[in-house]
Design a protein with these regions (language model features):
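Conserved phosphate/anionic-ligand binding catalytic regions in large, soluble enzymes, centered on
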Residues: 1
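FAD cofactor-binding and catalytic pocket of flavoenzymes
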Residues: 18-22, 28, 194-308
Length: 309
């Protein structure tokens, strides 16, 4: 995200501004990048100043071909930031170009929670309970969080007392828990005196476009992410619309991966009709009508009173 994303109402007259700015969050972005081991190249003129911890992923033949084409257009491009260890880092092996990253990384170079945050937490004597699901946050007679009610792996309801409860359940799970924690004291859910919990949900949809070139570009060697272009990111009213987008240039992943990732659609998208799925999709803006709420009558698989919708 860029600083302008936090002030779209002020800058462009659409949606709403965030209650905080980019620079308030920037130290936390930097700490997360450090913990996950983000590779990249400092100095991108189209991005806020930051210092990746690791050298960028090599462009390879694919990136070199992209760069040649983008340079002919006169557009901005820069090696992408990517959470892949390009050298040994925090006990993880470096990327050795085993192939694309979607199926996972046997080398341990691709960052994921189980090899970044969890090992540090476990070494700090944190107890990690997996396959559990929190139903609601409990409060005491003073209206303060006192713990959580959750289901263990066997579906048994349990209570875990706590002095502090930290919510980190993403843009859908977090409001679900807050709304499901309604009580006589908090009839509309916890932390919801504004009525905005679950509102202004911002997702990150993205379309894909595939192309072909005549020469060999070794698309199967190395992580998919190669470079990005911020040429169209910031508002340029001469285009006839406000806001913009990032162009992310990647390596190909081959027919097997395309088939695997298309299973959710129930069919393999192909041919001239396939691009119709992507038309009109862009980054969501914060608007009250878009959000996560709790269904009044439908229960989830664990029997909770509401299900996010």
């Amino acid at each position: 995200m860029h600083p302008s994303d936090f002030g779209v109402r002020t800058l462009d007259g659409v949606a709403d501004d965030w209650p905080i700015d980019y620079w308030t969050l920037e130290p936390y972005f930097a700490e997360n990048d450090r913990m996950t081991g983000v590779a990249g190249l400092a100095g991108d003129p189209a991005y806020p100043p930051h210092q990746p911890n690791l050298p960028p992923v090599p462009l390879g033949k694919t990136g070199t071909r992209y760069a040649r084409a983008i340079n002919q257009l006169g557009w901005h491009w820069w090696p992408s930031d990517i959470a892949v260890a390009t050298m040994e880092y925090d006990g993880r092996g470096k990327c050795i170009n085993l192939g694309h990253c979607t199926p996972g990384c046997a080398q341990g170079a691709k960052a994921s929670v189980d090899i970044t945050y969890w090992p540090h937490a476990l070494r700090a004597r944190v107890e990690l309970r997996t396959r559990c699901r929190v139903r609601e946050i409990a409060t005491n007679e003073h209206g303060m969080a006192s713990g959580v009610i959750y289901y263990d792996p066997n579906g048994v309801e349990r209570f875990q007392p706590a002095e502090v409860v930290v919510l980190a359940a993403n843009g859908i799970g977090t409001p679900r828990l807050l709304l499901n924690s309604a009580s006589t004291r908090f009839p509309t859910g916890l932390a919801n005196s504004s009525g905005l919990v679950g509102k202004n949900l911002m997702l990150h949809p993205w379309p894909q476009v595939f192309g072909y070139v005549a020469e060999e570009v070794d698309g199967d060697r190395g992580p998919q992410t190669v470079m990005w272009s911020k040429q169209f990111y910031e508002t340029d009213r001469s285009r006839g619309f406000v806001r913009g987008y990032t162009l992310q240039f990647t390596r190909g992943t081959g027919p097997a991966n395309e088939a695997i990732t298309s299973m959710a659609a129930g069919r393999l998208p192909w041919g001239k009709a396939d691009p119709n799925r992507a038309y009109g999709r862009s980054r969501d803006l914060p608007v009250p009508a878009q959000g996560a709420s709790v269904h009044a009558r439908v229960s989830d698989h664990a029997g909770s009173d509401g299900r996010s919708q």
